[in-house]
């Protein structure tokens, strides 16, 4: 409905049909929104996509909280968002040694109260390239809304922060900042933090699944990140 009333400049999955399975359960078919997932090249040199993504995410984050809360989606305050990240780090640290430099960097950011003064907003919660449908530099649709909630808008920017070129990010940030109505001075700093903590989230996923290959991959990625950052604060 938000798209139909021009509140957001992108479409979302629309049900085209469904069928019951013989042994229980159902299959749901959604309409093809068109377009394709962005490539590495798109996130590097596309001249139009940064502004399109910036407008789209700002519009999503500008929606009233009630758009999500009214349909029963979870709602978290800024402090609750911070505490959820702390809990994730604590869970990982109980099982695996996180590089000390990363732990210090993240702990300092999580304890910096100025970073966690922001208005919670409707967020997608798990934006990655396969969730986006683009065509000729324009975002057509966003799918994969199973993690949607009211919370930290930086979470939706984290993947872009980690994947896009510096030039892309500069144009994206300019458009997002211009279009976003609420004041959130540190959203991009938190997005960087979220992009790094995503490795811990992957590690915890491996721990829950008892998948040694995922655990080892995540640990190696954390070690590489620690070397790249070389003790720098956020």
Task: Identify the residue ranges that each predicted region occupies.
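An alpha-helical support segment within catalytic cores of ATP-dependent transferases
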Residues: 64-124
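ATP/Mg2+ or Mg2+-diphosphate-binding catalytic cores
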Residues: 202-234
């Amino acid at each position: 409905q938000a798209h139909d009333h021009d509140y957001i400049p992108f479409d979302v999955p629309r049900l085209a049909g469904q069928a019951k399975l013989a042994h229980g359960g159902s299959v749901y078919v959604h309409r093809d929104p068109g377009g394709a997932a962005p490539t590495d090249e798109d996130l590097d040199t596309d001249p139009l996509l940064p502004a399109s993504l910036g407008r789209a995410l700002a519009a999503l984050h500008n929606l009233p909280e009630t758009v999500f809360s009214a349909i029963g989606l979870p709602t978290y305050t800024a402090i609750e968002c911070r505490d959820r990240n702390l809990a994730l780090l604590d869970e990982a640290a109980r099982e695996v040694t996180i590089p000390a430099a990363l732990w210090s960097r993240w702990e300092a950011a999580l304890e910096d109260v100025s970073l966690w003064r922001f208005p919670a907003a409707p967020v997608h919660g798990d934006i990655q390239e396969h969730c986006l449908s683009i065509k000729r530099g324009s975002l057509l649709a966003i799918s994969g809304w199973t993690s949607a909630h009211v919370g930290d808008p930086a979470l939706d920017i984290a993947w872009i922060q980690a994947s896009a070129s510096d030039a892309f990010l500069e144009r994206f940030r300019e458009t997002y900042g211009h279009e976003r109505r609420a004041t959130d001075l540190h959203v991009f700093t938190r997005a960087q933090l979220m992009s790094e903590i995503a490795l811990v989230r992957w590690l915890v996923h491996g721990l829950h699944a008892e998948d040694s290959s995922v655990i080892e991959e995540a640990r190696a990625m954390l070690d590489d990140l620690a070397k790249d950052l070389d003790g720098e604060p956020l």
